[in-house]
Amino acid sequence: MNEKEELHLYHVSLQKQRNYVHSCIGHFVDYRHHHIRAQGGSVEGGKKGSKWRKQLQICMATQTQVELYDVEEGRLRRLFTRTVFGTITGLSSVVADGRSVLIVVGDSGKMSVLRFKYEGGRVRLEALFNEPLSRSGVRRLSPQAHVSVDPQGRCVLLSAMERNKVCYLMDVKQGELQVSSPLEANRPNYVTMQTAACDVAFDNPIFASLEIDLADGAKYLFFYMLDLGLNHMAKVADFELGDGSANFIMSVPDLEQYGINTKAGGPDDGDPDAIVPFVLMGFDNYVSLKDLRGRYDINVQIPTRKLSQKTIITAGTVQKLKRDFFMLLQSNHGDLYKVKILPDEKTASPVVTISYFDTIPQAQNLHIFKHGYMFANSEYGNSYLYQFENLDDEEESMLTSVMPGRRLIIEPRTVLKNLLVADKLALVNPILSSQLTERVPLTIATSTLGDVRLFTAGVNFMDIISSPLPAAPLDIWTVATNGSRFHKLLFIALQESTMILKIAAGTVEELELPHNPFVIAQDKTVLIAHMGGQSIIQVTENKMVHIIENRDESYESKLEWFPPAGICILKASSNSTQLILALSNNEVVYFEIGSNESLNELQDRIEVEERITALAIGNGNRSDYMIIASVDSTVKVYSLKVQDQANFLEVVSMQVLVSPASSLQLASSGGSLCLHIGLDSGVYVRSKLDRNTGELFDVRTKYLGTKPVEISLLLDMNPYINEEVDDEGEEEEEQDDEESLGGPHSRLVPCVVLHSGKTWISYELDSSLFIRPLLNDQSLKRVAQFTSNEIQRNGCCSISSAGFLVIGRIGTFRNNDCWFQESSLALPDSEDSVNGNELENDEKDPDALLEEKQKVNSSIGKLIIPDPDDIKLFYYCEYNEVENSCRVSLFKQGISYKHENSTEAFQLIPDCRPSTATIARFGLDMKHLVISTVNGVLKTFVIRITKAANNRRFELLALHDTVAGSTIHAMCPFHDKLLVPLANAVVLYGLGKKQLLKKSISYLPTSITKIVALDQWNGTRVAVGDIHESVTLLHFDERKNQFIPVADDVTKRHVTVVKFVDECTVIGGDRFGNIWLLRLPLEYDRLIKEGVDSYLLTLNTGIPSNIRECVFKWQLLNHFYINDIPMSFHLIASPQMADRASILYAGLQGTIGYLIPLITRREIEFFDLLEQAMRDADHLFYLDQENRLNDTSELNDGADEEGSVIDRRFPSVQKKRKIPEGAYSLVGRDAMMYRSYYNPVRHVTDGDLCEQFLELYPSEKNFLAARVDNRSVQEIERRINDMRTNCM
């Protein structure tokens, strides 16, 4: 088979990893007005602002993602995110010329120095240096495991896990950061556990290191000094630690500044003026203060929990005050300890005190900011921003080094005392299991250590008011008059009448007028619009009324216009000055309003051959075009340009559609005119309209359902609105956004709401089109913009298909960086069940976020079990370690079922710690829940579900327990039995009266020792995933009632999950972060179906079984490295009304990814070319720079030819400033090598890499577009965008 005819996949990450393993604080970028004023000039600056700013920004990184947050306002505000196609192993910051820059090391084998900059309304990250360190890859001897930065920013120490250390000097000369050649300090046969940079002011930089001697396993404390005069790195002190439990080290501020004597005196004290560095070390159950000269070894016990295991320190940070300092340490139990070093009253020698402070989730890093906040980068689950409420100094809970042997037992708090949760970063890490619960909108339920999270691909619509209407409504409009930006009147069209509501003081009530000029009965309203300064236009089927609002808020009719006798008005559209009416005789009437509020009709009319189905005119003050759609499936563009009288009311372009248009909207978006078309066939079409010629181009389509598509237009929407800010804080939030110097948070965009079988929303962000479901419990028929004093941004009012008036707000517009709307399922407990509440969404209850109290979570072993019949229903099992019980709950669409015989919403199963579970039928109508415990017992329950009006109940009836004999890690139903792997056999269990009965035992090849994944296909085949022997295909012989191994793999794979894609194809993942597809060749499949027994008899039986355990071998179709451990796969037939089936997967570290089949040769070739261009971007741009820098005459002339990218991106190229090699990948990592970390990537296009094309500068896009078969930039962007729009 030709390679182009094989299966090709397009991979894109919908959510990146969420395990932030690295973090550092600093002031990385100036993006606010007061930042600019502080540095005295330009946004790009850095030369004038040499003084240090407050470090109120935090940079966090997973292994593949860098993100920047600002905490200046006491909340986490994301400024930047960027995918790095490499594995980040170390991250730190260094202050250079008043601003912080990033130091990044990873598997690229380089030390990368990166700088954030604010440009064009957005934050970008650029590479300053990529200094080679070692070979690529994560290696034991590569100096990439530990990063320590001198507090004065003079040098950086990089340490390998074993032996190697290198130090780089850093300096700023003429406003440019300079990095020296590396200085080495190698110690063979020593493993480095941790390093720390000591506080020595402007003395020679000193670093402390905790290391292990491989010869005898002893642990040592080493001090290394960089001699700035000799430019040499050397060890200056080493101390063997008698206690081998040392595991933590952190530097201590210069104690001399706080009146503490650091020089004990002695003949070998060295320079008396030198600062003596101290470090605090963590051991089992105690901490110790040590110094460079070995004079001090001050110990103090750590307050420990009652009956707890050993307590060790895992994280710590230092906070310097004006005349004091303290350190916060965290133990492996999550307890925080406050450590202070004070001078002794008599000798002024250091005295260490430690006291219990609070308990928070276990953190990777702790960071304290100058304005009284602390960020805890949690190891698992959510990360929190805390505010200090007080600095507790209770002496009764304090231990001191004066009595080093004294111990203290503490009772950890379950409610915070000294800290207050100010904000949180909702993270899903780890993902233990997942389940697809809905296809439209695409919804995934995931279980983590904390709770169940729902990920929904859509945009939130938050209900504020919902009220039933007396009759079935047809349409809705809002009107703001007399120049006010707040809407005053609300019109609802019914079948033969119109309802008029008045909006005032936060209430909506019916408008009562003594003399009502509006048509409210015996006619159907087609359009209500505000025109001119104080005019309201009402268009009904039988007339058009021009109404004026007076200053006393009364209304009077100024004009009534009637169509010819026997003719009715079908459609109407307007803007501030223009009005068009479509009549039933296929004529279009055009009006304009003058400055004196008079409405003037143009005598010439447009005549259309076919019946008009829709028409539209551009929003704003005046439109140059109007659009008319006819029943002949065409859309025609007519010119309304005053300066082009020859073509006035003439057709300038036309578009042929697949079916007649049911709705049209013309709106300006991002500097271009966009025509939105809804078709009778359920297809939505978006075309762009050329402002000069009126031609239609850049056509995008999306199938939304079987019903006709109606379109509602919403203008001036804030795509980045903070959903967690309430109405009172909304105005303050807008002012904060405006301070971002016109950044993306202050830009307003239009959007259209699409009404079909479900409600959708279409909008453009950063030149990409998004068509997403609008998330609401009710399907909306029409939507109109709604702005009031209470809802000042993104407000809208709508009528639902159930006949309700709904007033609410549209939430944050999701983009590629934030694809899902995330919410939490409130897990039922005894208190919740009584109140009956189910779905807890942080966005709906912001007060719960700000006043959240930290509690210790003792639940582990969480499983999501899908129901075989209902995709929306799933069972949730969680094990409580304290009670040694398993709790089972049922959820459907975010609502939990109540228990049949109690008020609880769960059922407890005592003495049960589950390892896996599944649903089986056993040939009966009733379903059975089978739970496998870690003790090797199969617990079988009958599931009984009762449904009544607004009341769903369930009960688990225990049948019996079956002893399996060993822990079972996977099982699945097979026909009317249960398939269970035991050792190197698979067993079919049937239902018995007292236990499950073994109906069949099939032995597998001897190489299979531990089966961890299992899946079956239509009761004929089973895929078995072994912990290290890849996947084996079993064929079920019904005559023998046995499973026959027919195919295995030629490569060892450490399987974590396996799933059938079709009868001959499986997809799987392994614990090294690889995803692969294996297929049984068709000729082998034919032989198996013809009869595998007869084929086996023809084979040469002389071949030993250990060489050929199975007669057939899998063929590798696809292979891809995702840098996360796949935990589950889901095959989705038509997600979000997509045009093809796809595969969704969830990774352990929070990754949610998507694999889309490329179905045409043209798609495959295009994305192959684009991916290759992006892979070669580093080389192409660097080569282009070298060629142009060698051409001196071209540089002097300042030529700016197409394809030249360097001078556009870096104006300083004129001064010979060179872009480092590998700058466009940031860290200099080859993308092909990264995706082929363990095995070569095969037939998978890296969509994440292709989408980086959208982030490039325009000149860079042009440069690379020439390498993609000379395609235009617009076509490349459209093809990339279409993969998300039409396929997911």
Curated annotation (Swiss-Prot):
PANTHER family per the UniProt record, alphabetical: DNA REPAIR/RNA PROCESSING CPSF FAMILY (PTHR10644)
GO molecular function, one term: U2 snRNA binding
Top-level taxon: Eukaryota
Subcellular location: Nucleus
Family: Belongs to the RSE1 family.
Classification lineage: Eukaryota, Fungi, Dikarya, Ascomycota, Saccharomycotina
Keywords, in A-Z order: mRNA processing, mRNA splicing, Nucleus, Spliceosome
Protein name listed in UniProt: Pre-mRNA-splicing factor RSE1
GO biological process, one term: spliceosomal complex assembly
Family annotation (Pfam families): Beta-prop_RSE1_1st (PF10433), Beta-prop_RSE1_2nd (PF23726), CPSF_A (PF03178)
Annotated segments matching region Disordered: 725-744
Gene behind this protein: RSE1
Gene3D superfamilies found in the cross-reference section: YVTN repeat-like/Quinoprotein amine dehydrogenase (2.130.10.10)
Function field: Involved in pre-mRNA splicing and cell cycle control.
